[in-house]
Amino acid sequence: MEYKALIEDAAKAHALPPGLVEAVVGVESGGNPWAFRYEPQYYERHVAPDASTRAVAPCSRDSERQALATSWGLMQVMGATARSLGFQGAFLNALCDPAMGLEYGCRLLARLRDRYKAQGGWPGVVAAYNAGSPRKAADGRFVNQSYVDNVARMLGGVWPQ
């Protein structure tokens, strides 16, 4: 993968397995740092109801609200998530910078590891990365099992310890 050294550095900084970070990058963006995706359902559920969204100069309030509901960069970090993790830049598209996107993606992955790994292992952490929490359906599979399976495939079917 083109950004292997940056992936290894970001993973190491957050005590994450580099192979896992590389697998998430592969599934999320296919290694394209300029990948972005507006997620209207996220906007409707999490951004639109929050009247407190402030504009980050020189960005308009409306632009900021749209950017919060967009996933950015190699790890497809949601703008709102990046802000909650301390991103202060005026424009959330800065997350398309490979090092910046990896930093915030790994911050999130490390936070989810600390919260969910003991109960769900890496599959639970990965499910939470994609869906916010490792929710399971009535059949005992993750609600986003196909995402978890895609990451597992990128890992060659072997989860890190």
What are these regions (language model features)?
Residues 1-161:
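Catalytic glycan-binding domains that act on GlcNAc-containing polysaccharides
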